[in-house]
Amino acid sequence: MQKQHQRQHKVELVANLKTQFADAKALLICDYKGLSVRKLEALRNKACAQGIKVQVIKNTLAHIAMKETGYSDLDLKETNVFLWGDDQIALSKLVFDFQKDHKDHFVLKAGLFDKESVSVAHVEAVSKLPNKEELMGMLLSVWTAPARYFVTGLDNLRKAKEEN
């Protein structure tokens, strides 16, 4: 009876992971060996505030969920923490910022963007891109520049006429 209950729990967990992985635009797998529970909880709290999921999952269960969701095949070994979400940039920034502070205990092992495997270097490059809010600010600045220059030009013309 106990084994059947455990098996049912695992089946439900895999089904839940499949639905969450299917909706995710990015999935990162990190080694967290030696990281304290308190620090892992701090990572979870930061991630949750950004809509990013963090979970320690058995490799066999994660492999089944990923395979059935259409992710490229990964060789999962040792201890892994899985982070996934919709914003590739925010997820990459979160992982590399956390990794910077915990070099010895937290390392990115693999990354998947849009269900395709990407290198650690690619994820690091994405982490250096501006986030959505910064991009919107840049775009707004570009859009308002012509009007700003026009108004400045008119003001300079007015000042020149006042001096004459």
Curated annotation (Swiss-Prot):
- The reply to whether Transmembrane helix figures as a keyword in the UniProt entry is no
Q: Record's superkingdom? A: Bacteria
GO-annotated cellular components: large ribosomal subunit
Q: What processes in GO biological process is this protein linked to?
A: translation
SUPFAM superfamilies on file: Ribosomal protein L10-like (SSF160369)
Known Gene3D superfamilies for this protein?
3.30.70.1730
Query: GO terms for molecular function, please?
Result: large ribosomal subunit rRNA binding; structural constituent of ribosome
Q: Which UniProt keywords apply?
A: Ribonucleoprotein, Ribosomal protein, RNA-binding, rRNA-binding
| Similarity comment text for this entry | Belongs to the universal ribosomal protein uL10 family.
User: Self-association or partners: how does it assemble?
Assistant: Part of the ribosomal stalk of the 50S ribosomal subunit. The N-terminus interacts with L11 and the large rRNA to form the base of the stalk. The C-terminus forms an elongated spine to which L12 dimers bind in a sequential fashion forming a multimeric L10(L12)X complex.
This chain's function reads: Forms part of the ribosomal stalk, playing a central role in the interaction of the ribosome with GTP-bound translation factors.
Record-given protein name: Large ribosomal subunit protein uL10
**What is the scientific name of the source organism?**
Helicobacter pylori (strain Shi470)
